[in-house]
A protein has these predicted regions:
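Peri-membrane helix termini and adjoining interfacial loops of integral membrane proteins
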Residues: 34-45, 121-135, 174-178, 217-226
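Juxtamembrane inter-helical linkers in multi-pass membrane proteins
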Residues: 174-190, 274-275
Length: 289
């Protein structure tokens, strides 16, 4: 029971940390949209902005721990199937995506810790660190056999995830894992729908640029979160588009804090999770052999 409670606490801390990062990204982008300063950067730019705030390094250290917790929970939940996705093609795809996102949040946690303890330096305004990361791995993928097709396929998958988010925002159950009072539904559901809609738009833009990068065999066409936001800003009435999506990202961040409090966490026992991970590794080794 103690091990289960430890994992549940880890998950809740992680959801809160992810929510804070999204609120930072959305808040800064919203400020940029209305001309009140801000920035249209990605997650790393948002974290770097805390260096200019009082006790910013302390905040970064706390967020780094939270992101590490979320990375751990993503891997544990994917391996143990804590969300009961099952072993169907769709279920395995979602669990696989969670494994990948776990490593992404681990990288973000290391970056936040680097800012807090001086291992890393923050980018400038609109530094595009997210774009540089996307362009870096896109260049690596393009250098592989059939790289253009692989990058295009990744772009289509990302865009497909975006469409899925939009569908969930439109008529899906965004609160199926939450346990909250009926009177809270009036604000929890709209918050979740706005958040998933904004993520859907961002993923569609990122996926589209990845397809373009693959089609043209130019990694410089790839965009990350910051690049997607700047693309919106550069359109006619861009401040409106950016403002809407930025508000949605902030809403998704707030929804993350709601998840930290109200989400049903079916955390496995630590020993059971370790055993399942070992069995999964053994099954994978047998398939390779």
């Amino acid at each position: 029971m103690a091990n289960t409670n430890t994992l549940e606490t880890t998950a809740r801390v992680g959801y809160a940390a992810r929510g804070i990062v999204y609120m930072l990204v959305g808040g800064l982008a919203l400020m940029a949209a209305v001309g009140a300063g801000g920035d249209t950067g990605g997650s790393r730019d948002a974290l770097a902005s805390l260096l200019d705030e009082p006790y910013g390094k302390v905040l970064l250290a706390v967020i780094a721990l939270g992101l590490l917790a979320f990375a751990v929970w993503r891997e544990v939940a994917a391996v143990s199937d804590a969300d009961h996705r099952g072993s169907s093609g769709k279920g395995l795809a979602i669990r696989g995506a969670h494994v990948i996102s776990g490593f992404a949040y681990l990288s973000l946690a290391v970056y936040a810790a680097g800012l807090a303890f001086g291992w890393a330096t923050g980018g400038g305004s609109g530094g595009g660190s997210g774009d540089e990361g996307a362009q870096g791995w896109s260049a690596w993928l393009l250098a592989q056999p059939f790289g253009r097709w692989l990058l295009g396929l990744v772009g289509l998958v990302v865009a497909g995830v975006g469409i899925g988010f939009l569908g969930r925002a439109w008529k899906g159950d965004v609160t199926k894992h939450l346990r909250y009072a009926p009177e809270q539904r009036g604000w929890v559901v709209p918050l979740g729908r706005a958040g998933f809609a904004a993520r859907g738009v961002v993923f569609l833009i990122i996926g589209g640029f990845l397809v373009l990068a693959g089609w043209q065999a130019q990694s410089s066409e790839a965009r990350g979160l910051g690049g997607a936001l700047r693309t919106l800003q550069e359109q006619p009435y861009g401040w409106v588009l950016l403002g809407l999506v930025a508000a949605g990202l902030f809403a998704f961040g707030a929804f993350g804090v709601v998840q930290a409090v109200y989400r049903h966490i079916d955390a496995p026992d630590v020993d059971d999770a370790a055993g399942e991970a070992k069995r999964a590794a053994q099954r994978g080794a047998r398939k390779i052999g």
